[in-house]
Amino acid sequence: VLGPFHVENGPVLENGADTCLDGKGEPLVVHGKVRSVEGAPIEGARLDVWQCNDDGFYDVQQKGIQPDFNLRGIFHSQKDGGYWFRAVKPRPYPIPDDGPVGMLLKKLGRHPNRPAHLHYIVGADGYEEITTHIFVPDDIYIDSDAVFGVKESLLADFIKVDDPVRAEKFNVANPFWEVEFNFVLAPKSG
């Protein structure tokens, strides 16, 4: 699910950069590897990431309130396929429900809420691009996502870390959240 809040040409950031520009939320360190189906690391894979802020809004929904490109960034995997960045633990939020979508949800007796998640578009030269999310598994809406985007393979372990040494290593406040998520890219056919 791409969703309506993706922005083309987001800021290209170095690994380890902090995407949170409004200072709200619980610190989160996100890391993982990008590999081929054979398990080889993919250097230079492009990871376009975005999420809502701690109030449940994307920057494009709050122009003039949130900084532009808040909680957005484009990262490139390192030689070992690794990537990492700093953000905030995602929150659930309601999708806009003041139009036809809202009427449909009401008729179906469904709520408009999405469980907490991070968005990714991941691709590399010679590989198929994937558009996906990773979800917080214990979110209240995990079993009733308004857009039916949750799959078991997209549930990630968001772990609360209380370790001043690790917090200093990642340049985040202690305690903080940490999530590791790895991607496997298939080669382009033809």
What residue spans do the PLM features occupy?
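Beta-strand-dominated extracellular/periplasmic modules and repeats
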Residues: 1-190
